[in-house]
Amino acid sequence: MGLIKKQIEFLDKFTKGKWTLNEKTGLVDIEGDFDCSRNKIERNYYGGVKALSDFKEVKFGVVTGNFYCVHNTIKSLKGSPQEVGGNFNCSYNNLTSLEGAPQRVGGNFNCYHNKITSIKGAPQDIGGDFFCSNNNLTSLEGSPQRVKRFFGCSNNNLTSLVGGPQEVDDFSCGGNPLASLVGAPQVVSGYFSCTNTKLTSLEGAPLEWKGNYSDFYRNPISEDTINLVWKTMRKNKIDYRTALISLKGEIPAKDWKKMSSAL
C-alpha cells in the first residue's frame, strides 16, 4: 500500500536525508535524520505554530540518524521508528505511555516532560543516556537493565526504584518521594544523585560505586550522615542495617532518630 499526498509532504518536509517506503512491510526507512519538532514547523499567519498531534499515520521502520518530535501534542508513539541509529527524543508532548517506542536506540532516549505513568514499552537496547524525568511515573518496571551512560528519573512520583536499571554510568532520582534506595542500581561508575526526597534509609544503596561525585542535599537526613553511612557500606561490603549499628554514637542524634527505625 502506497502513501497518500499528505504523508509524502510530511516526509519530504522533515526528513534530512533520504526516505524510502518498503512496499512489503509498509514501513518508511530513513537514511539520515527526521525532525518534526515544533521549532521546525512553519509559523502561521499570526506567528503561532501549529503543533503535531501524530505522525500522519506514517509507520517508520529504521532511521539511521536521529528522530526528533519534541514540543508537540503527540499522545501516542504508534508509528514511531522500530530502530533509531542516533538519538530519539519525544520530550514535551502529551504522552502517557511508551508503547510503540523504538526497541533499539543507538544514542540517547529522551521522553521527559510528558504525562507518562509507565515505562513499559521503553527500548531495552540503548547506546547512550535514558531520560524519563518530569513525568507521572510511579514505577520503573520495564526499564532497560543496563544503561551505558546516564539514567535520569527525577521529578516523578516514585516511591521505589524497583525495576530500574542495575548497572549505569550516572544515576539521578531526585525529586521523588523515596524513603529508601531499594531497587537502585548496584553498579554505578560515575555520578550518583538523590536530592530532595524523603530519604531516611540507605537500604538498597549501591555497594559498587566508582565515581567521584554524589549529591544528597535537601533530604530529611543530613548529607554528611548519608555519605558516612554509604561510605561504610561500600568500604566493608555490608548492608545498611549492619553499617548503621557500627556507626552508633557517630551519627548526630537528629539523624539517628530517623534512621534507627530500621533497627
List where the protein language model places each region.
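An internal, amphipathic alpha-helical element
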Residues: F131, C173, Y191-A205, F216-N219
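Canonical leucine-rich repeat
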Residues: N44-Y45, L52-V58, L77, V84, ...
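LRR N-terminal entry segment and analogous cap-like coil->beta motifs
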Residues: K13-C90, G106-G107, C111, G127-G128, ...
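N-terminal capping/linker segments that flank leucine-rich repeat
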Residues: M1-K59, I226-L263
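Leucine-rich repeat domain C-terminal region
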Residues: N196, L207-R241
